[in-house]
């Protein structure tokens, strides 16, 4: 099922910065928020408890990649935090992903990173020594993720349709790198607008700087949300 709220990437360096940002929104508004490495390492698990206590949904974006037993144990801890979604690197392999699923349980969604949206095909071929196309690599990882019993993948919107064809229509495609028209793309190599992401079949979208660095973050959020959901029935 598609998520109507764009996920806001809380790419802030401190707990206080998050509090200041969220204070801009009405207290009764439930948001879907992404906590990444920078914020999690700065603020610790308490940031998740704080956000959940405010009634928000949390995507904990730590991209775990380690031996299966270590990942399983880490996921058990994350499940106790009450996260709504978290992720691993598909490159860790099927056994690692299965261990992650077992550790996390079924209450939260578990997705895998295929190729980062900052990765170009040339970079992948040179530094990862993967001598296929970028799309072929993404499809391969998506199939292995489905085989491991995970809920979906993080992927570029350009890859959504081929991933759903290679797996199944209900396989979640979470798309970062979303930028409204006219907004700088930053360090993302593969980007798309919210409306385009909807049309192509993305289930979740993640938006960071176009909201967090906007002159009016609340207005920017609602404009992106409106664009994302404008064609929903």
Swiss-Prot record:
Function, in words: Catalyzes the decarboxylation of orotidine 5'-monophosphate (OMP) to uridine 5'-monophosphate (UMP).
Name this polypeptide is given: Orotidine 5'-phosphate decarboxylase
Keyword Glycosyltransferase among UniProt keywords: no
Enzyme class, spelled out: lyase
Entry EC number(s): 4.1.1.23
Ranges in coiled-coil conformation: none
Pfam families reported in the protein's UniProt record: OMPdecase
Binding site for substrate: 11, 34, 61-70, 117, 179, 188, 208-209
Recorded family membership: Belongs to the OMP decarboxylase family. Type 1 subfamily.
Pathway connected to this protein: Pyrimidine metabolism; UMP biosynthesis via de novo pathway; UMP from orotate: step 2/2
Active site positions: 63
GO annotation terms (biological process): 'de novo' pyrimidine nucleobase biosynthetic process; 'de novo' UMP biosynthetic process
